[in-house]
Amino acid sequence: MSRLEQIFKDAKAEGRAAFVAYYPAGFPTVEESVENIIELSKHADLIEVGIPFTDPMMDGPTIQHAADIALENGFKVKDTIEVVRRATEAGANCVVMTYWNPVLQYGPERFAAEFAEAGGLGSIIPDLLPEMAGRWKAACDENDLDPVYLAAQSTTMERLEMTTHAGGGFIYAASHMGVTGAQDEVDKGAQELVERCRKVTDLPVAVGLGVRDGKQAAQIAAFADGVIVGSVLINATEQGTLVEVAADLAAGVRAKA
């Protein structure tokens, strides 16, 4: 069992889902992102450290806005390594969420080695399909990193089986069709997607895209192994309420509505 899987196993042993928090490195500055990620890690079991990118295909306006601010403030891909290093030293568990282009430009083998050395546990690369990920998979294997893949409601069972077998750590189940961003209601297809994933894999299944508050987190925690939250944490950062929002979400995950 990988270190990433163990995080979900430990949460399950406590009778709850894992709380997974997405936060972009460099937002609003590198130093502040380190501080905020460390603060989040007091509430979240796992941090998805995002790499700001100029052309994100999956990110909604909130995360795009955060990426723009980070890039305007001079963020570089190499800063991700330092953010993860410092967060890990403070006790955070980190995976990276990025698009393939920044990793490719940096050098996949170099990035994997440096990220793992900094304490990283795995990667989520939405635009890198398993059948195209041979080079990255080799780099992950070499550095004991889990490549995490996404599953959507539109994914066929055949495709789902292939994707889950290729991945590691956990499965990222997209709770609704479209880009990231807080939603008013939990998509009814999310639970069905989790059940479909469980038919073809023993990996934990975490649900993301659209969680707005503790109440929604509790609804998802009732059927998923993990609850992934992102956009609302960025909004909370700008409103000065990150600690309160993180605590509310953590309580929701543990409540299981």
Curated annotation (Swiss-Prot):
Enzyme Commission number: 4.2.1.20
CDD domains from the UniProt entry: Tryptophan_synthase_alpha
Pfam families xrefs: Trp_syntA
The protein's annotated pathway: Amino-acid biosynthesis; L-tryptophan biosynthesis; L-tryptophan from chorismate: step 5/5
Source organism (scientific name): Corynebacterium urealyticum (strain ATCC 43042 / DSM 7109)
Keywords assigned by UniProt, alphabetized: Amino-acid biosynthesis, Aromatic amino acid biosynthesis, Lyase, Tryptophan biosynthesis
InterPro entries in the cross-refs: Aldolase_TIM (IPR013785), RibuloseP-bd_barrel (IPR011060), Trp_synthase_alpha_AS (IPR018204), Trp_synthase_suA (IPR002028)
Transmembrane in keyword set: no
UniProt protein name: Tryptophan synthase alpha chain
Function noted in UniProt: The alpha subunit is responsible for the aldol cleavage of indoleglycerol phosphate to indole and glyceraldehyde 3-phosphate.
Gene that specifies this protein: trpA
Catalytic reaction list: (1S,2R)-1-C-(indol-3-yl)glycerol 3-phosphate + L-serine = D-glyceraldehyde 3-phosphate + L-tryptophan + H2O
Subunit-level organization: Tetramer of two alpha and two beta chains.
GO cellular component: a single term: cytosol
GO MF entry, a single one: tryptophan synthase activity
Lineage, opening ranks: Bacteria, Bacillati, Actinomycetota, Actinomycetes, Mycobacteriales
Active site: E48, D59
Protein family per UniProt: Belongs to the TrpA family.
